[in-house]
Curated annotation (Swiss-Prot):
It is an enzyme of class 4 (lyase). Keywords: Isoprene biosynthesis, Lyase, Metal-binding. Gene3D superfamilies: 2-C-methyl-D-erythritol 2,4-cyclodiphosphate synthase (3.30.1330.50). PROSITE patterns: ISPF. It holds the Pfam family YgbB. The lineage of its organism: Bacteria, Pseudomonadati, Pseudomonadota, Gammaproteobacteria, Alteromonadales. GO terms for molecular function: 2-C-methyl-D-erythritol 2,4-cyclodiphosphate synthase activity; metal ion binding. The gene is ispF. Its cofactor is a divalent metal cation. The record marks 36, 135 as: Transition state stabilizer. Pathway: Isoprenoid biosynthesis; isopentenyl diphosphate biosynthesis via DXP pathway; isopentenyl diphosphate from 1-deoxy-D-xylulose 5-phosphate: step 4/6. HAMAP family: IspF. A divalent metal cation binds at residues 10, 12, 44. This is 2-C-methyl-D-erythritol 2,4-cyclodiphosphate synthase.
Length: 159
């Protein structure tokens, strides 16, 4: 069996008058995230982790923010594309661990929905997907509620 590990990180600031979408789930909040796509910072970090595990660059290479085709793009579509690239090389998800770093909004009420969406998009067992959230104790840009940061680690395996 061959395994590959990928790490993804992404940050977006608050400020768009649109829904806040995280893991494909609408999370009630006063503002959305600034981005060329739909701004789903979680799915961007996961996509980067998958691409990194496969040595395929990053989402900026595959979906440049200078390309009008990706303006307002659904990040679930982007994630599924990245995962399809891994699957085409014979790899499948072993597990996924995500950390959402945000002072606000509270993520706990939405975590299970997020896991379900990820399991569906990655054709995986929800038991292989972990999503957790933490704050920075009011320190830094996330602590000042200026934006959200996300780290994702993915294990892909090929039999």
């Amino acid at each position: 069996m061959k395994i590959r590990i990928g790490h993804g990180f992404d940050v977006h600031k608050f400020g768009e008058p649109r829904p806040l979408i995280l893991c494909g789930v609408e999370v009630p909040y006063e503002t959305g995230l600034v981005a060329h796509s739909d701004g789903d910072v979680v799915l961007h970090a996961i996509s980067d982790a998958i691409l990194g595990a496969m040595a395929l660059g990053d989402i900026g290479k595959h979906f440049p923010d200078t390309d009008a085709a990706y303006k307002g793009a659904d990040s679930r579509v982007l994630l599924r594309h990245c995962y399809a690239l891994a699957k085409a090389k014979g790899f499948e998800l072993g597990n996924l661990d995500v950390t959402i770093i945000a002072q606000a909004p509270k993520m706990a009420p939405h975590i299970e929905d997020m896991r379900q969406v990820l399991a569906a998009d990655l054709n995986a067992d929800v038991a292989d997907i972990n999503v957790k959230a933490t704050t920075t104790e009011k320190l830094g840009f996330t602590g000042r509620k200026e934006g959200i940061a996300v780290e994702a680690v993915v294990l892909l395996s090929r039999q």
